[in-house]
Amino acid sequence: MRFNVILRYVGAVMLCLSAFMAVSAGISLVSNDAGFYPLLLSALLTLLLGAFPMIFVSKADSITTKEGFMIVVGSWVLSCVVGMFPYLIWGGEFTLVNAWFESVSGFTTTGASILTDIEALPQGLLFWRSATNWIGGVGVVMFALLILPSLGTNKMALSGIELSSLAKDNYRYRTQMVVKILLTIYIGLTIITTLLLKVSGMRWFDAVNHAMSACATGGFSTKNASVGFYDSPLIEWILIVIMFISSLHYGLIYSTFTRKANNIFRSEVVRVYAAIIVGATLLIGASLYFSDTYENIFTSLRQSAFQVVSLITTTGFATANTNLWTPFAIVILIILSIICGCAGSTSGGAKVDRVLLYGKVLKARLRGQQHPNAIIRIRLDGILQEDRQVNTVTLFLTTYFVLILLGTLSSALFGMDLLSAFSSSVAFIGNVGPGFGAVGSLDNYAELPSILKIQGSILMLMGRLEIFGFIQFLFIRMWR
């Protein structure tokens, strides 16, 4: 394994991050706030980290699979490390552990925060927080692949590693188109969202920040009360639509606009996903109305729809204190936080594709018990699922729930109540953000012991890297 090659590619990612830090510093300079020097110094340090390997290490004609995993996972981890720099230099609530937690939460698009007063941050730092969401939404490596043409033909190997296996199955295009498709949709959707939010009453700065977070399904807001600060049905419905679109498979979005056969409207996964959202919204809305949580059915359904879409897409924006909702509503929201959005999107979580496939596997096994000699084929969105794919999904979901269980046990060991411990573990591994109980939708993670913040950051990284990518990185020396 050639570590010099790995350093060159990771260095490319660092150059991208330094550019975003420089933009954030420019915002602080224009707004004349105290975030300028922390961001400028961070940009220079990150630039140096990225420039040296790019200058002194020659390009490689090819990279191995092992090197590819090291590049992708190493880029994510180092991005989280340099992402700490502006927070640490700024100080305030950002201790070493808090800065690490906030950085990991941003890049993994979890959106969980240790800040007790978000609005006290300078505008430049607020923009940097949202930028970490936006960069992490499509993948830190993907940005480097788009921006730096010097990475050459190895782009394809890296983009394949960055995507989950289910996502790759659903991209029915030439591999070299994947990066362009992803980022064209991503950037276009961000611009459209910004304009819509501005027209709806947000300031330009807030509109840009919320657009970046919404399209990344990240959830960082510039307000302590999140989207609830605006108390605007129009803003809420705009964000509901954008969060939903962002949680759909980007390949299917592209197919829909290019009028190909495999599009959103013909996708079995999207139909099931939409049905789950509508069903959950109606059930929770009815629960809120009949429990007199809200004064009328329309407000109940609006609040229900926003929180349902926010959690199932793993965005984590909030307009209500869900801790005050009925136990029935809370249970449904936790289930949605486990299922989450579609593969090939910016959403985290187990993915509705996997859950649906697992349901088909169970159905096939039951049929196999009734008809032992039958040959039962399992298809998902028209694609025949091989035994290897089925076994991978089963193993993934098993590992996913084991990690939630271990996270819950560990959190309970350090004094968290069961609801807070379980929901925070679900929120971390699923990159959802808010949980329930002590870490509810309008609360934060400031009071967590440092050890649990570190545990949470590890779970966030594992979730964002689809678990196995992180595990393979840890045991990469054992590969043959």
Describe the function of each predicted region.
Residues 1-480:
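Membrane-proximal intracellular helices of multi-pass ion channels
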